[in-house]
Regions:
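Pre-Walker A (Motif I) flank of P-loop NTPase domains
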Residues: 23-26, 184, 211
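H-loop/switch region of ABC-family ATPase nucleotide-binding domains
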Residues: 249-251
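RecA-like P-loop NTPase motor core
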Residues: 257-318
Length: 318
């Protein structure tokens, strides 16, 4: 069954109809202000009741930050529309929940705030250090092209009270450190910004349920272009193994060029058009990075013989 969201008169979006694709990694790109963040908030609502409250912030002033539009969700012939009432609550027009029919176990929205840039202090260690899970060590080393994380340790800290169990493995109860000599370590507080952002992202992905929808804002955040490409390889493998649907918002040409599933959001007249399977060169050109599609070297030859000679010896010339 087709699954679709229609956003009307919300923030900068007058109208957008977005059809959800199947499993795999999908790149969503477009100019700033085209509606990527708004779309992610609407997608997050499929499994998160507080998505509108945390994503559509308001003030107490009567003429500021008003949301007068609507968000409609479709699964086949079924539909539910949410609007914001005078009470301040977002309410559906019908009392039936079609969100379960989207068939996602959960929706995980990894934005550029809070947990993405979180670093754990070492003020109150609770237990002796333990080796870090092999999957995390391998992923960090592989994506960052290093071996510095091979002996990384995990230290349980903070308040371990929890109703859900496994409190010692929660990110807020976990600190990481790397040994530099006998009985000497440096903690994650001294990791580079790119390292801590990647560590937190991987932690979130690993703790996501299979068959879930994952929304990642600005995947390239603080990462070298080569690391971005290796991270994309990792995410493609995770999506395949765990049946994940991953949406990534980005302006990174390195990321856009690595994926065939590029979705371009483009403002046309009075609406946001959605272009699926968009060629990377078109997407890059649309977001104003024309230089990234231009050749590094242009060689002009006199005739076909010169062209053949150049092609035969191209490696030594270029």
């Amino acid at each position: 069954m087709d699954r679709k969201i229609i956003i009307s008169q919300i923030r900068n979006i007058n109208y957008m109809a977005f059809k959800l694709p199947g499993e795999g990694v999908h790149i969503i790109t477009g100019e700033n202000g085209v509606g990527k963040t708004t779309l992610f908030t609407c997608l997050s609502r499929i499994c998160n009741n507080n998505a509108y409250r945390t994503g559509f912030l308001t003030t107490n002033l009567s003429n500021y930050d008003k949301y007068m539009g609507s968000i409609s969700y479709f699964v086949g012939d079924e539909k539910v529309t949410y609007t914001k009432r005078t009470s301040g609550r977002w309410q559906p027009d019908v009392n039936k929940n079609i969100f379960k029919k989207f068939n996602y176990k959960s929706v995980v929205h990894i934005n550029t705030k809070n947990e993405r840039i979180f670093t754990q202090s070492m003020d109150t260690p609770r237990r002796n250090p333990k080796p870090v899970d092999v999957w995390l060590i391998n992923a960090m080393n592989s994506i960052l092209n290093t071996d510095k994380f091979s002996n990384m340790i995990r230290i349980t800290v903070g308040d371990l009270r929890s109703r859900t169990g496994n409190a010692d493995k929660r990110r807020r109860n976990t600190a990481f450190a790397i040994p530099i000599s006998r009985n000497r370590y440096y903690t994650e507080q001294n990791f580079s910004f790119g390292e801590i952002v990647l560590l937190n992202l991987l932690y979130d992905i690993e703790n996501t349920e299979d068959n879930s929808l994952v929304l990642i804002d600005e995947l390239e955040m603080a990462l070298h272009p080569a690391a971005q490409v290796r991270l994309m390889d990792y995410l493609n493998e995770m999506a395949k193994q765990r049946h994940l649907t991953v949406f990534i918002s980005t302006h990174s040409t390195s990321i856009i060029k690595t994926n065939k599933n590029v979705i371009l959001l483009e403002r046309k007249s009075n609406e946001i058009k959605v272009f699926y399977k968009c060629p990377p060169a078109k997407a890059i050109g649309t977001i104003g990075m024309r230089e990234d599609t231009m050749a590094d070297i242009i060689v002009i030859v006199e005739d076909d013989m010169a062209k053949a000679l150049f092609n035969a010896d191209r490696k030594s010339v270029v």
